[in-house]
């Protein structure tokens, strides 16, 4: 059994449901300590984190990842027990194989190989690992990033092991992510008997035209790296459940996934301009859950795409699609270049999550060449 697979099996066999770690990080730090990494355990609240670094020079290349996994749901629906870490038909099965314990194992074996091949490599190698990525993400990477900023630890390049591939390993990497803005809109009408609409003011009717305008608005057209900003309605709720009452209020939950062509403040302002045209009373509260970030083509992107070309002989597509990730904290707090590169995302968060054993070995090889491209 090769080193990557052995490490992956050891990690996957631990039921580290978010925000629990249950010893995954000890496996990692034990491995790294033998490679002369300085380990700093950082526990915030109930969340386990660690920072590890080898070297004292720049550039500083950091691998960021998480040891927590999402719940398995109904375990009876799994064909193979989610924490048995079984291999079948060339696939390693289990919760977290793709998201993202396979990446952790691949980077550990790549680091081991790189340090042995280049013991006097330039720069420094760091690891930023948390058990709070799949949950609230309040005591994990964001706290570690703030700690690193406080101690003046520079991070030049950060590779995040999130599963980025869509059809084959290496076909897509993420060089940024869109921002996320949520709005909770309350449209205020007047409750009344449904047979006497002239004595009431139906907030659902008031909402329809305004929401249609919001849905049809062109917020921006995106740019070279980002698709156009997306506006979606996720929830609409109104009424008491009976058939003869016009409701007094209607609640609507909105979401923007926005590009660098807009700021969240600009989007908030434009929403209010549109709502104000409709002359009804409303209240709106906002929750900004993530800024957009972008790593343009440059040293880190080139190191990743060239490594993929070397190992897989394919041309990689850059993407900023998908949800938010911990990469945003590292990009925004530490001002680092950030790229997400990991295995296929086809089975993540699903029953029977799995990853190809060959892909794990190839991913380790890709990570090795990224290290080589940055630090030699």
Swiss-Prot record:
EC number: 3.5.1.18
Catalytic activity: N-succinyl-(2S,6S)-2,6-diaminopimelate + H2O = (2S,6S)-2,6-diaminopimelate + succinate
GO BP terms, alphabetized: diaminopimelate biosynthetic process; L-arginine biosynthetic process; lysine biosynthetic process via diaminopimelate
Top EC group: hydrolase
Entry-linked SUPFAM superfamilies: Bacterial exopeptidase dimerisation domain, Zn-dependent exopeptidases
Biological or metabolic pathway of the protein: Amino-acid biosynthesis; L-lysine biosynthesis via DAP pathway; LL-2,6-diaminopimelate from (S)-tetrahydrodipicolinate (succinylase route): step 3/3
InterPro entries documented for this protein: Bact_exopeptidase_dim_dom, DapE_proteobac, Peptidase_M20, Peptidase_M20_dimer, Peptidase_M20A
Positions contributing to Zn(2+) 2 binding: 99, 134, 349
Keyword Metal-binding: yes
GO MF term set: acetylornithine deacetylase activity; cobalt ion binding; succinyl-diaminopimelate desuccinylase activity; zinc ion binding
Active site: 68, 133
Keywords from the named record: Amino-acid biosynthesis, Cobalt, Diaminopimelate biosynthesis, Hydrolase, Lysine biosynthesis, Metal-binding, Zinc
Annotated Zn(2+) 1 binding sites: 66, 99, 162
Entry note: cofactor: Binds 2 Zn(2+) or Co(2+) ions per subunit.
Similarity annotation: Belongs to the peptidase M20A family. DapE subfamily.
Role description: Catalyzes the hydrolysis of N-succinyl-L,L-diaminopimelic acid (SDAP), forming succinate and LL-2,6-diaminopimelate (DAP), an intermediate involved in the bacterial biosynthesis of lysine and meso-diaminopimelic acid, an essential component of bacterial cell walls.
Official protein name in the record: Succinyl-diaminopimelate desuccinylase
Source organism per UniProt: Ruthia magnifica subsp. Calyptogena magnifica
């Amino acid at each position: 059994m090769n080193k990557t697979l052995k490490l992956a099996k050891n990690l996957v066999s631990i039921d580290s449901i978010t925000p629990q770690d249950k010893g995954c990080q000890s496996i990692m730090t034990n491995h790294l300590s033998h490679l002369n990494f300085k380990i700093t355990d950082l526990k915030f609240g109930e969340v386990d984190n660690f920072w590890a670094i080898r070297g004292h020079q720049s550039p500083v290349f950091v691998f960021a990842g998480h040891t927590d996994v999402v719940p398995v749901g109904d375990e009876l629906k799994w064909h193979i027990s989610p924490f048995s870490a079984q291999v079948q038909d060339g696939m390693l099965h289990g919760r977290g194989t793709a998201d993202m314990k396979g990446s952790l194992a691949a980077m550990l074996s790549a680091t081991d190989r790189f340090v042995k091949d280049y013991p006097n490599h330039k720069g420094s190698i760091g690891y930023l690992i948390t058990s709070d990525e799949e949950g609230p993400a309040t005591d994990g990477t964001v706290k570690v990033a703030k700690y690193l900023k406080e101690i003046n630890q520079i991070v030049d390049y950060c590779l995040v092991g999130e599963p980025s591939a869509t059809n084959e390993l290496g076909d897509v990497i993420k060089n940024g992510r869109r921002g996320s803005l949520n709005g909770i809109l309350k449209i205020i009408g007047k409750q009344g008997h449904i047979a006497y609409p002239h004595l009431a003011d139906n907030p659902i009717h008031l909402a329809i035209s305004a929401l249609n305008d919001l849905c049809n608005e062109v917020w921006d057209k995106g740019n070279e790296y980002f698709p156009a900003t997306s506006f979606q309605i996720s929830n609409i709720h109104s009424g008491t459940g009976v058939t003869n009452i016009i409701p007094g209020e209607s609640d609507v939950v909105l979401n923007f996934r926005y590009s660098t062509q807009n700021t969240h403040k600009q989007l908030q302002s434009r929403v209010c301009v549109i709502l104000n045209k409709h002359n009804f009373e409303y209240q709106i509260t906002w929750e900004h859950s993530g800024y957009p970030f972008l790593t343009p083509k440059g040293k880190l992107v080139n190191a990743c795409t060239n490594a993929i070309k070397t190992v897989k002989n394919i041309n990689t597509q850059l993407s900023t699609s998908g949800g938010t990730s911990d990469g945003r904290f590292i990009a925004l707090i530490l001002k680092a270049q950030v790229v997400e590169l990991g295995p296929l995302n086809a089975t993540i968060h699903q029953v029977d999550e799995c990853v190809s054993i060959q892909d794990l070995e190839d991913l380790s090889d890709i990570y090795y060449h990224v290290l080589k491209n940055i630090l030699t």
